[in-house]
Amino acid sequence: MARDTGGNVASGLIVVDKPGGLTSHDVVARVRRLAGTRRVGHAGTLDPMATGVLVVGVEKATRLLGHLTLTDKEYQATIRLGQATDTGDAEGTITSARPAGHLTLAQVQAAAAALTGEIQQVPPAVSAIKVKGRRAYQLAREGTPPVLEPRPVTVWSFTVQAVRPAQAGSPGPSPGSSPGAAPDGSPGASPDGGPGDLLDVDVEVRCSSGTYIRALARDMGDALGVGGHLTSLRRTRVGPYGLSVARTLDELASELTVLPLAEAAAEAFPVRHLTAEQANSLSHGGRLPGLGGAAGLGEAAGLGGAAGPGEAAGLSETAGPVAAFAPDGTLIALIQEEDGVARPLAVFVP
């Protein structure tokens, strides 16, 4: 376990491969016990049924988390066509059921294509979005699901990998969660998922933060006229952090792998090198002259050649946070350039 000179767990990121059945907060609680500190948070909530990459910050790295959630994400998912649920996933109650066995691969691909690009997405009613100070899921559980407004999201790719008949016993709402006829009065498909009634669609999605894969499943089903919900979800990447660097909770219990703060910032953000004078000023909350683009951005000194993601791309001053490093490779702050001035978003020293 990496610790600082005072014997405390070192500041940094822990990339967890979250198991199904745990909330993101459950994972944070486990990491708090493993790290011996309460200063732990996570970036980008995963639903309990979902598995995969959950980025957890420890100590000073918790200040990175609010900015990491702005990055794009990748998922592998299975969508069940022929049943809609009140939550948009397999943990909900079936609200409608229609035969989907007649659908072709081309039709499913067309529905996915229509949900690709910059779209307006209505979040699921059972979500953590706040409505007049309360979470939407709380209102939904009380029998008054809120009407949520569409939000702009970007789906860079929505790839259909396979379309297959749903198998009996495969993940989905329990057969007893809905009658055979759909509540909306349509004849409906059997909730048991009889032969030809239901289709499972395996997809890969790359999307912006804030995109609900449950909503993509719902909207695909609606577009095809049969309803749809999510039966499995695995997040394979958040920004630069993929499954290859993720560790299970059991693995972390054996060895707590912490990505050091400076290295984590260099991987997640473009890098700006500072003079000693600039580093001192910024560490005390001072502002710096802006660069007006990518000039001066590149590899972080003393980080083994790690390069920030903005090194090769010409960045505008509105591109997002930049990691500012002192000449000795110490991460000083995240900065944002606006109107020709770079101001600190989060300072990490002293």
Regions found by a protein language model. Give the residues of each.
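RNA pseudouridine synthases
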Residues: A2-A168, G196-A215, D219-S244, L334
